[in-house]
Amino acid sequence: MKKILCLGLVLGCVAGFVMGCAGKDLPGDLEKDTIIEECHNIIEMVNDRDFQGVVNLFRDDLKEQLTADALGQALNQPLDQLGDFVKYKTESVAAAKEDNTDKDMAAAVIGVEYSEGSISYVISFDTDMKVIGLYLK
């Protein structure tokens, strides 16, 4: 039986988000391929346990609230349980709004297969391509 991991990093004003319709245009100049490429970059950093590199990609106000140590403490155990990266399984990107501010954003859900299980990364970006949310489920 597959274990279901649910890990939420609640970051300041990003308490959550509401996914928009998948057919809705992405905000600003954001492009689906660019978002997916950046998600792959982030997931590779997570897999390499380069948590400072991940934190550096967050929006400035969120960097003040998140440390590489805290991110590592949250992610090391799930990563240990999942084993080695195998492949990306699914990728989707949708327009969304930040709950607390109603600002435009984009959210990507990337399904990833590991040697001991699978997990979905939910990564959200503001219109400047700064990370504003990182969730594993």
Please place each PLM-identified region on the residue numbering.
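Sec-dependent bacterial lipoprotein signal peptides
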Residues: 1-19
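Internal amphipathic alpha-helical segments of the cytochrome P450 catalytic fold
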Residues: 18, 51-52, 131
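Short, low-complexity N-terminal intrinsically disordered segments enriched in polar/charged residues
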Residues: 21-48
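Short hydrophobic/aromatic segments of transmembrane alpha-helices and their interfaces
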Residues: 36, 54, 113-115
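Short solvent-exposed beta->alpha transition segments
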Residues: 52-105
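Exposed beta-sheet edge and beta->alpha loop/turn motif
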Residues: 92-137
